[in-house]
Design a protein with these regions (language model features):
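Active-site residues of response regulator receiver
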Residues: 22, 68
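Two-component/phosphorelay signaling modules centered on CheY-like receiver
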Residues: 25-45
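Conserved phosphotransfer cores of two-component systems
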Residues: 38-39, 58-60, 82-90, 106-108
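Helix N-cap/capping motif at the beta->alpha junctions
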Residues: 46-55, 76
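Active-site beta3 strand of CheY-like receiver
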Residues: 60-66
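Receiver (REC) domain active-site loop signature in two-component systems and cognate sites
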Residues: 71
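Hydrophobic/aromatic residues positioned on beta-strands within the core alpha/beta folds
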Residues: 95-96
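C-terminal output helix
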Residues: 118-130, 135
Length: 143
């Protein structure tokens, strides 16, 4: 069963923002549909790779970034590292079919980790959990 209400995010005067990052357009569309269905109040943007995601992060503040791990251009690791260094207040969710290749440091730095394919309930639970974890953390910068 899906929770009916998402946790409160850092966005108090605007709709929570989610950035979806995946080089597979069908995955982006599927994630987008899940969020539209279960979290219609979220503003959802997408990036097709690490470089585009990092650029998007410089343009807007996001509450959650859900990124694939394996992508060209540094992949999800590059996105995760940019979030850790420059946007520690942003919830970080990793989504991949190759989680076995995720090193302990990156696994620890993610607020939630999802194996592909994930169910709608797992996706929403991961995003909600990541938002709650960030809300309970003191703001910090690594590095």
């Amino acid at each position: 069963m899906l929770p009916s209400e998402p946790p409160v995010s850092h966005a108090t005067l605007r709709r929570p923002r989610v950035l979806l990052v995946d080089d597979d357009p069908s995955v982006i569309r599927a994630l987008w549909r899940v969020l539209r269905k279960h979290r219609p109040q979220f503003t959802v943007n997408a990036a097709s790779g690490a470089a585009q995601a990092i650029e998007a992060l410089s343009d807007l503040t996001y509450d959650v970034v859900l990124t694939d791990l394996q992508m060209p251009g540094g992949g999800g690791r590059a996105v995760l590292e940019a979030l850790i260094l420059h946007h520690p207040e942003t919830a970080r969710v990793l989504h991949s079919s190759q989680l076995g290749s995720l090193d302990p440091f990156h696994r620890q730095q993610a607020h939630a980790v999802l194996a592909k394919p994930a169910s709608e309930a797992e996706i929403i639970a991961a995003i909600d959990s990541a938002l709650l974890r960030v809300a309970s953390e003191p703001a910090r910068r690594v590095g």
